[in-house]
Amino acid sequence: MVVNILVVNPNSSKSMTISLQETIEKTISKESCEISYFTGPNTSPPQIDGQETSVQSMKACLPVLTDDKGSIYYFQKFDGILIACFSDHPLVTELKDVAAKEKSNVSVVGLLDSSIQYCNLVGRNFSIITSNKEWIPILNASVQSKFLTGNTIDKNLWKGTVSTDLQVLALHSPDNFQQIADIIRDENLRKLDSEIVILGCAGFSGLQNKLAKKFEKEGTLFLDTIEVGLEILITMIKFVRSQK
């Protein structure tokens, strides 16, 4: 049976949604998933670059997803929802809370929680590469306070966050690829000794294979958080369905 998923871009940049869709259509079979896409309304910021814009986007998106039962984006019309922002985005928790109150079986995941849990299971050194520097303390605090397992902490597998010092919308520009690759080599690999590098922003979507090829000799695993998030979400949906 086909699963019905909503991918939520919580900012108001339609170009980011288009980029997400292009990446997803290359990796996820249409035969197994029916995927719809939501872009934040005009009251949502054009890009999310910290805690303030995260909260702003949550307040803009949540009513659209939960208040109007006739809307094509009403959350209960989907089996699962992926919040496509790499942060401890408050929309993830808020949607889960609404679903729990209404006793809905919809599964909700974000990019940060799903990718960190994947790394916890793999059990190898990992770090994050992100956009602007403001994200470093935010992501480090979120990961360390909420998402690490005891085993990951005991083995010191979590190595921290590195910034490209680029804004979200600039990450996808071909002109910046070499700069991003140089930072990964110097900081994530040499300095932090990472075996897995999480591409910690939706703006990196689609760069996984290009970076893997660039660092083929090093054997680095690059984690496309959209792909990992979707695969985990699909597994959750199938498990819920198996109980019926």
Language-model features, listed with the residues they occupy:
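Eukaryotic N-terminal targeting leaders
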Residues: M1-V3, R241-K244
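N-terminal beta1-alpha1 ligand-phosphate binding loop
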Residues: V3-I28
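Short hydrophobic segments within beta-strands
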Residues: V8-P10, F38, I128-S131
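N-terminal beta-loop-helix "entrance" segment that forms/cooperates
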Residues: Y37-P63, V168-P174
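N-terminal glycine-rich phosphate/adenylate-binding segment common to multiple enzyme folds
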Residues: Q56-A99, V109-L112, E195-Q208
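Short, acidic/small-residue loops that bind anionic groups at enzyme active sites
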Residues: L95-V122, K214-L233
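Short, hydrophobic alpha-helical segments
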Residues: V122, N188, L230-S242
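Active-site rim beta-loop-alpha module in soluble metabolic enzymes
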Residues: T130-A202
